[in-house]
């Protein structure tokens, strides 16, 4: 399920990705229980055959010309991910899919995974756009007190939001000491650390993170004296209170080292599992006390601004849909 829509996603003719509503027009059986034959989706109940556009192609011993279409969702495969547009198909624009340089460039390595989390997708965005929680939720891996002490900058660029935090002359926490060693660098010397969070609506966050030996330029330090990566956070709402969370890390140092990729992935998976527990418990509290007011502090600027962007875009999309319906009436 994506955005409260039950979907079946599969590869049709020519391995092209297709997404249909998970509903057979014959008797309402889930098409996801079917099979793929000759690039078409075959219902596992009575053998009705569906095309990628939602039209019924055939059915054993039955004429199908008058069968109603089911909904087809625009879908594209790029950068190793499937991108589905769950809204009005007439408003789908593939140009809105962000370009991911690290996904197409062999100079980068990527490792990641998928978690199902029982929380509102906006809670995950809040979490990612304010990394002060690392000090407490991830104390044994990436957290340290200097995160709390570093000032945070926040700026809006159109529909995108960027927050940044820089720390100088600190000791690296355990995860980043291991990353320094992975790049063949000393891990017991002072470092400069950075966190730059970039929110792209509706629900994607890319975070530039890293450490460099102190005094070598920090974020702009030469590659041979730093360990840096891009934390990938693609959040797909499932329902109002659950998400599919695609997480990972892309790095440009030693991309050929598959063992290092596996170690980083394992460490990152453990870190994100800590977020999972916190977010699910937070969601339970919010459902139990929906009327209780919540505080907005200085550290919440990233989450607050990202929600404003989402609200503005939702309002604009609804207005566009209303205009389209008006023209069709």
Curated annotation (Swiss-Prot):
Residues in Rieske domain copies: 1-84
Pathway(s) the chain acts in: Xenobiotic degradation; vanillyl-alcohol degradation
Keywords noted in UniProt: 2Fe-2S, Aromatic hydrocarbons catabolism, Iron, Iron-sulfur, Lignin degradation, Metal-binding, Monooxygenase, NAD, Oxidoreductase
E.C. code: 1.14.13.82
Positions with a binding annotation for [2Fe-2S] cluster: 24, 26, 43, 46
GO biological process, any: lignin catabolic process
Domain of life according to the entry: Bacteria
Entry annotated with the keyword Transcription: no
Pfam family, one: VanA_C
Record's cofactor remark: Binds 1 [2Fe-2S] cluster. Binds 1 Fe cation.
GO MF term set: 2 iron, 2 sulfur cluster binding; iron ion binding; vanillate monooxygenase activity
Catalytic reaction list: vanillate + NADH + O2 + H(+) = 3,4-dihydroxybenzoate + formaldehyde + NAD(+) + H2O
Required cofactor names: [2Fe-2S] cluster; Fe cation
Quaternary assembly: This demethylase system consists of two proteins: an oxygenase and an oxygenase reductase.
Family: Belongs to the bacterial ring-hydroxylating dioxygenase alpha subunit family.
UniProt xrefs under PANTHER family: 3-KETOSTEROID-9-ALPHA-MONOOXYGENASE, OXYGENASE COMPONENT, IRON-SULFUR DOMAIN CONTAINING PROTEIN
Protein name: Vanillate O-demethylase oxygenase subunit
Gene name linked to the record: vanA
């Amino acid at each position: 399920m994506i955005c409260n829509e039950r979907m079946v996603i599969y590869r049709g003719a020519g391995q092209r990705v297709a997404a249909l509503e998970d509903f057979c027009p014959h008797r309402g059986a889930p098409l996801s229980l079917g099979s793929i034959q000759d690039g078409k989706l075959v219902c596992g109940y009575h053998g009705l055959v569906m095309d990628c556009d939602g039209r019924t192609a055939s059915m054993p011993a039955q004429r199908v010309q008058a069968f109603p279409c089911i909904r087809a969702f625009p879908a594209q495969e790029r950068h190793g991910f499937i991108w589905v547009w769950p809204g009005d198909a007439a408003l789908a624009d593939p140009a809105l899919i962000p370009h991911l340089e690290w996904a197409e460039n062999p100079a980068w390595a990527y490792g990641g995974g998928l978690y199902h989390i029982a929380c509102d997708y906006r809670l995950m965005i809040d979490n990612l756009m304010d990394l002060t929680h690392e000090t407490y939720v991830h104390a044994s891996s990436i957290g340290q007190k200097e995160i709390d002490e570093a000032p945070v900058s926040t700026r809006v660029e159109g529909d995108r939001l960027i927050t940044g935090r820089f720390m100088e002359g600190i000791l690296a926490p355990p995860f980043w000491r291991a990353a320094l060693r992975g790049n063949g660098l000393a891990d017991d010397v002072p470092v400069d650390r950075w966190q730059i969070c970039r929110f792209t609506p509706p629900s994607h966050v890319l975070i530039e993170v890293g450490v460099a030996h102190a005094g070598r330029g920090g974020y702009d330090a030469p590659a041979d004296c730093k360990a840096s990566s891009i934390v990938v956070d693609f959040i797909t709402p499932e329902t109002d209170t659950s998400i599919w969370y695609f997480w990972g890390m892309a790095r440009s140092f030693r991309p050929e080292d598959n063992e290092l990729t596996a170690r980083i992935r394992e460490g990152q998976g453990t870190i994100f599992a800590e977020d999972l527990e916190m977010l699910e418990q937070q969601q339970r509290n919010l459902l139990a006390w929906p009327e209780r007011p919540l505080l907005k502090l200085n550290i919440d600027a990233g989450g607050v601004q990202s929600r404003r962007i989402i609200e503005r875009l939702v309002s604009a999309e609804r207005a566009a849909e209303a205009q389209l319906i008006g023209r069709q009436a």
